[in-house]
Amino acid sequence: MQMKKLLPMLIGLSLAAFSTMSQAENLLQVYQQARLSNPELRRSAADRDAAFEKINEARSPLLPQLGLGADYTYSNGFRDQNGLDSNSTSASLQLTQTLFDMSKWRALTLQEKSAGIQDVTFQTDQQTLILNTATAYFNVLSAIDALSYTQAQKQAIYRQLDQTTQRFNVGLVAITDVQNARSQYDTVLADEVTARNNLDNAVEQLRQVTGNYYPELASLNVDRFQTDKPQPVNALLKEAESRNLSLLQARLSQDLAREQIRLAQDGHLPTLDLTASSSVSDTSYSGSRTSGAQGSAYDDSNIGQNKVGLSFSLPLYQGGLVNSQVKQAQYNFVGASEQLETAHRSVVQTVRSSYNNVNASISSINAYKQSVVSAQSSLDATEAGYSVGTRTIVDVLDATTTLYNAKQQLSSARYNYLINQLRIKSALGTLNEQDLLALNGALGKPVATTPEAVAPSTPEQDARVQNSAPDSNGDGNGNSNGNGLLNAALPR
């Protein structure tokens, strides 16, 4: 009876899980999954947590040190003429408190700064994961578009090949027109193989970042897609000066190197510790004793003792150890300072390059939009000219290739713009999850990510093209039915 009640519930949960898995993932969801499963980010988080935990380790020598000791000794005097056996027990409690030791305080400061650097490193890795996830996501969408346009180009050339074959069969065109069309069709077939492979690789790259395969992803909604000019480059540089994480990490590393010089110099300073202890001991004897020994050194004893004291130490000369350590730390500081300058130059270059890339992407989008319109008009005019004999099939094929190349370039320019926008935010040090949420507004309907779903294979069509070449005598025997390559009209 219970199984009958549980069965509908289990079925419902299974269907709900399947429904959830079957929904297309958007960019924000993909990143959230990557954030939970990406091993590099989790390793960075563990390193950060370990660095902060190490602060407690560095603080511990400054806190009271309390220790308990105990000892038991049994002695047998088997060759002693007195034949004495003894049992000794002792216990002690020791307390040590550092009163002055600048090197220990400096070590604590160093570890706090090291933990701060590790925290910045973790933030950098977070931004890197955001950028890598978005780049991999848009690379998949770009590869999908490229394969879709290649497939559409193949079908367009297939229609042109069919029409040219029909015109050849009735003697309107020469065989060279058919051969040119077939050559172009074969070229597109090779392009399709490359496009399929690129899509497979892009999907695999996304899997590497997130740990998951996605049968569907939310595609770019071209109607909602908009471009925005970035801020003036000087304003971006000013913001990057204060917020760029690589620059911040380099500054913290320089500060850490400066603190290490002070730590080395502290090797000349004295140390002062407070010590306190309490101990008890008990000794008992057994066995025969000489009369002279009776009541002397062999009496049982029970002793207790308390001690309080100060321990002072001042290093006078250590063979030049401290001076050498100071010089090493100074050299390390010079290296850290040069690394800061390197980071500063790199940030300036990254910000300017990102700024230029965003502007170039915007210009490319506008140019390719017009290019698509012009290419479509050119193709329409060329096809009309070919119909009346003023243009050749080569002109038509070239115009077709130009159109679909322009469409692919426009698609790539859109994705490059989105990626460059994220890169400029990363250069500023402001890239976060909210930026992905904003990009989600430009996404729309789901699209399949498998090559076969994007562009179904057409083996029969490809075989028909290969097996239907007209003979060079122009008698039309190359096509068995004289109706061209198509059994049914393809949609335009």
Annotate each predicted stretch with a short phrase.
Residues 43-58, 125, 129-149, 159, ...:
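Amphipathic alpha-helical coiled-coil segments
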Residues 5, 128-243, 357, 361, ...:
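Periplasmic alpha-helical coiled-coil/stalk elements that build and connect Gram-negative outer-membrane
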Residues 85-87, 300-304, 405:
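Short sequence motifs at beta-strands and strand-loop junctions characteristic
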Residues 409-492:
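Acidic, low-complexity, intrinsically disordered peripheral segments
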Residues 72-76, 99, 278-284, 314-316, ...:
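Transmembrane beta-strands of outer-membrane beta-barrel pores
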Residues 32-42, 49-64, 92-110, 120-127, ...:
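A glycine-/polar-enriched beta->alpha junction
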